């Protein structure tokens, strides 16, 4: 989490007012939850590399997670339980490694690092009870020797700067970070999460309380920062205590703030839902609209209907040099024994398959070769 905040805030100007800590210190312990997923077979040995973990890398990891719907359901459900009882430090899942930080790879499929100041017995029992129906194995819920002491500070007279991004551990939420000053080498402030639907309200609430808002915008393939400036007189932020910026996040309680009367329309979002698709999986003989941005081609409309989830096109060698920007129509075919597709109409240049004549239309199978029943999974013909 600390690495994520550092990366998200790296290009934003932050207050440099030096703060003095209070005598009160927040003491926290670390717990590591790890387990294997039953019947989960996956290997990326010799291929996987992720040296930095930028916000773009985190968004890519979340996109990869969409290809593992069952595993995502288990992990996301567990995260929702933990958020109400502890603070999430990081998540490990074999296909994408550590979600926000950089660390050694563990030996289990899933690891969740949390910090807490409540009862470990209660957390452990909730974890065990939740995972019981999912047949996980090698489950471990253990505290480490790592103890964290978080300094606290009074709210200074300086005006804070706010950064808004997606919350990496649950994209149903946005992350709101307010920077007030510094102590030694650490920035000091307070962090909140709020349902993503409340983003316009959060922005209007913050405007009279901060010098500026820097919102991370998901541009599909890259991120940008949108600066929103305050145009009204600044009011004092309604909190009494700050901490060093860390894993501690609070739920944003809108009742503690003045209700905004107007809202500015937003044409950007910290997180856009998306998943990877093969052109084989798209419907045949209907118009499909695609956009290309930052080296990523994605689909926004099918059959004149806007999609609620962006579909990122996974290109094969046949179309690797094509840029999908416009509309196209495709159809699935059996060509030389291979189940594939061809583009039959497009507003942009694409290579074509000149002949699709195949009288027998026999497709080579990956297994069950003697069966008269033929279909495909997402990866195989059988």
From Swiss-Prot:
Single Gene Ontology BP annotation: viral process
Primary localization class, coarse: virion
Any one Gene Ontology cellular component term annotated for this protein: virion component
InterPro entries assigned: Poxvirus_F5/I6_dom (IPR007674), Poxvirus_I6_C (IPR022219)
GO molecular function: DNA binding
Induction: Expressed in the intermediate phase of the viral replicative cycle.
Keywords from the UniProt entry: DNA-binding, Virion
Subcellular location: Virion
Family to which this protein belongs: Belongs to the orthopoxvirus OPG082 family.
Function: Binds to the hairpin form of the viral telomeric sequence. Might direct genome encapsidation into the virus particle.
Protein's name in the database: Telomere-binding protein OPG082
Species the sequence originates in: Monkeypox virus
């Amino acid at each position: 989490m600390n690495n994520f905040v550092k990366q998200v805030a790296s290009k934003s100007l932050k207050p440099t007012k030096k703060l003095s800590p209070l005598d009160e210190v927040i003491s926290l312990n670390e717990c590591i939850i790890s387990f294997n997923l039953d019947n989960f077979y996956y290997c990326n040995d010799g291929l996987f590399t992720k040296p930095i973990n930028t916000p773009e890398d985190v968004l890519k990891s979340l996109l990869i997670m969409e290809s593992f719907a069952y595993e995502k359901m288990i992990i996301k459900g567990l995260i929702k339980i933990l958020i109400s009882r502890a603070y999430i430090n990081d998540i490990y899942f074999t296909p994408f490694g550590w979600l926000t930080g950089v660390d050694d790879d563990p030996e289990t499929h899933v690891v969740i690092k949390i910090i807490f100041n409540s009862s470990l017995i209660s957390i452990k029992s909730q974890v065990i009870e939740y995972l019981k129906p999912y047949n996980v194995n090698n489950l471990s819920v253990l505290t480490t020797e790592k103890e964290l002491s978080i300094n606290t500070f009074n709210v200074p007279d300086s005006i804070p700067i706010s950064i808004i991004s997606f919350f990496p551990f649950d994209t149903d939420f946005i992350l709101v970070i307010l920077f007030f000053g510094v102590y030694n080498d650490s920035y000091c402030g307070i962090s909140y999460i709020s349902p993503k639907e409340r983003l316009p309200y959060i922005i209007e609430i913050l405007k009279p309380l901060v010098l500026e808002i820097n919102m991370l915008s998901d541009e599909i393939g890259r991120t940008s920062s949108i600066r929103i400036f305050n145009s009204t007189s600044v009011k004092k932020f309604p909190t009494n205590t700050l901490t060093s910026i860390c894993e501690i996040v609070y739920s944003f309680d809108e009742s503690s703030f003045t209700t905004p009367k107007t809202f500015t329309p937003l044409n950007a979002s910290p997180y856009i839902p998306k998943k990877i698709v093969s052109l084989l999986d798209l419907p045949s003989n209907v118009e499909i609209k695609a956009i290309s941005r930052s080296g990523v081609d994605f689909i926004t409309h099918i059959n004149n209907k806007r999609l609620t989830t962006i579909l990122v096109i996974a290109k094969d060698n046949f179309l690797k040099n094509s840029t999908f920007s416009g509309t196209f129509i495709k159809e699935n075919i059996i060509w030389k024994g291979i189940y594939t597709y061809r583009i039959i109409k497009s507003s942009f240049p694409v290579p074509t398959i000149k002949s699709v004549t195949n009288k027998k239309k026999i497709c080579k199978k990956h297994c069950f070769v003697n069966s008269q029943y033929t279909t495909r999974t997402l990866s195989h013909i059988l």
